[in-house]
Regions:
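A cytosolic small-molecule/anion-sensing beta-strand core signal
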Residues: 7, 140-141
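Short, well-structured alpha-helical segments that form the helix of a local strand-helix-strand
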Residues: 121-132
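ATP-binding N-lobe of GHMP and related small-molecule kinases
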Residues: 1-96, 114-123
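DPxDG-like acidic metal-binding loop motif
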Residues: 96-122, 138-140
């Protein structure tokens, strides 16, 4: 399965207040832009999640949002992981504030939902995505 994961920009970002957990409540206006990574998800026989990218310095383990998305998807749905490989062709600039990792995670959640016919709603995918990062729910929509 091939999926595009689109970058997003913040057009406006206002800090509302600081929460007890140290994070801030924000009011943001965001917009998707026409820069995307190409994600390919396919089955493998390893019974594990494997990941590869075209950028050697990106993590291929739990430090990668796409990997986390797959792991959390299988936990949340109780679907046994038959083994999947995620290939990411990064075209969204890394660490540029364009939500590239979050977008990749959202694409993996949506792709696995379709692949495994899990039937999760967009709302549920967004809830799962929030466990990965604050931008993932936006990217799911």
């Amino acid at each position: 399965m091939k999926i595009k994961s689109y970058a997003k920009i913040n057009l406006s970002l206002d800090v509302i207040n600081r929460r007890d957990d140290g994070y801030h409540n924000l009011k943001m206006i965001m917009h998707s832009v026409n820069i995307s990574d190409d994600i390919e998800i396919r089955m493998n026989k390893s019974k594990k999640i494997t990941i590869a990218t075209n950028l050697k310095y990106l993590p291929n383990n739990k430090k990668n949002h796409a990997y986390c998305a797959a792991e959390i998807f299988f936990e949340e749905t109780k679907i046994k992981n038959p083994g999947i490989h995620i290939n990411i062709l990064k075209k969204i600039p890394v660490c540029a504030g364009l939500a590239g990792g979050s977008s990749d995670a959202a694409a993996v959640l949506k792709g696995l939902n379709e692949m495994f016919k899990a039937g999760l709603s967009v709302k549920k995918l967004a809830e799962i995505g929030l466990k990965i990062g604050a931008d993932v729910p936006y990217c799911v929509h």
